[in-house]
């Protein structure tokens, strides 16, 4: 049997069999967890589908809801990392931040809808509302500022600093744009 379990809310951690050191607060939080360990889920349906994932933190309504086997994710905000299934080491802070990320790994996003449409892109950093919003499969981009690189879909190794910096870039690689307003 599992040790170190805290479950508050209807169906919270109800399927847990051997996962140790899990905390679930909220209706259906960590409901599908069976053997995943060291997870924290706070909010209605937070980490709902996690079964064997470990060392994940999800705070907010439906944060990390689709995660099944992912490890080391942090999702803070309503629907942050919503579609995430198995990628690891993603950090998403803000409503709908990395909403569509399924298998991408090593991404860091902060801001409302930052990296919202990312699917499998890896090692990206987006800070600011809608920064890198349309990124789908691109890797190694850094966008800092509201709407920085928000139009980028597949361009890699880009750096954009400032409000709307590189907003029109969609597929270019190795661009560096700095806008000061």
Language-model features: where?
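Glycine- and small/polar-enriched repetitive beta-structure motifs of secreted/surface proteins
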Residues: 1-181
């Amino acid at each position: 049997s599992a040790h170190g379990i805290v479950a508050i809310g209807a169906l919270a951690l109800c399927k847990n069999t051997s996962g140790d050191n899990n905390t679930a607060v909220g209706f259906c939080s960590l409901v599908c967890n069976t053997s995943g360990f060291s997870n924290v889920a706070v909010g209605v349906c937070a980490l709902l589908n996690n079964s064997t994932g470990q060392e994940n933190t999800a705070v907010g309504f439906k944060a990390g809801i689709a995660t099944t086997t992912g490890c080391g994710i942090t999702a803070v905000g309503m629907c942050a990392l919503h579609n995430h299934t198995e990628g690891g080491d993603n950090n998403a802070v803000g409503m709908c931040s990395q909403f569509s990320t399924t298998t991408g790994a090593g991404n860091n996003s902060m801001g409302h809808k930052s990296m919202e449409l990312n699917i499998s892109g890896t090692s990206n950093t987006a800070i600011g509302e809608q920064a890198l919003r349309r990124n789908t499969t691109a890797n190694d981009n850094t966008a800092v500022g509201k709407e920085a690189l928000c139009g980028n879909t597949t361009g890699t190794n880009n750096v954009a600093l400032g409000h709307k910096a590189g907003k029109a870039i969609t597929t270019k690689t190795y661009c560096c744009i700095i806008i000061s307003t």
